[in-house]
Amino acid sequence: MRHYEIVLLVHPDQSEQVPAMLERYKTLVTAANGKVHRVEDWGRFQLAYMINKLAKAHYLCLNIECSKETLAEIETGFRFNDAVLRHLTVKRDKAETGPSAVMKRVEKEEARKSSQQETAA
């Protein structure tokens, strides 16, 4: 089995469906004897350029271990899901389990915002 990192850009109006989407993709991987090593919800970010007349998207990151057939099935699901604006799959040498650089930045910004709210109150 191979290790993959998948980054998804989801339509911002479909943000409430993100947990269900993640659960569906995790179920696909585990049903095919694969493993899910890391799932990160990075939140909404500004896009570098407009995609389908949208300036923002909801970002997700999955690190999985599965066969290439399972990956093909997952990517086919991305293509037929209108909520997925873009996806990128990268083959990794080993499983990534720690927080990604983007997730560290998101957590740092959330901590900064909460400390500012505490000092303002």
Curated annotation (Swiss-Prot):
UniProt biased composition (Basic and acidic residues): 104-115
SUPFAM superfamilies: Ribosomal protein S6 (SSF54995)
Entry keywords, A to Z: Ribonucleoprotein, Ribosomal protein, RNA-binding, rRNA-binding
A GO biological-process term: translation
Gene Ontology molecular function: small ribosomal subunit rRNA binding; structural constituent of ribosome
InterPro entries with a match to the protein in the record: Ribosomal_bS6, Ribosomal_bS6_sf, Ribosomal_S6_plastid/chlpt, Transl_elong_EF1B/ribsomal_bS6
Protein name: Small ribosomal subunit protein bS6
The organism of origin for this protein: Leptothrix cholodnii (strain ATCC 51168 / LMG 8142 / SP-6) (Leptothrix discophora (strain SP-6))
Gene: rpsF
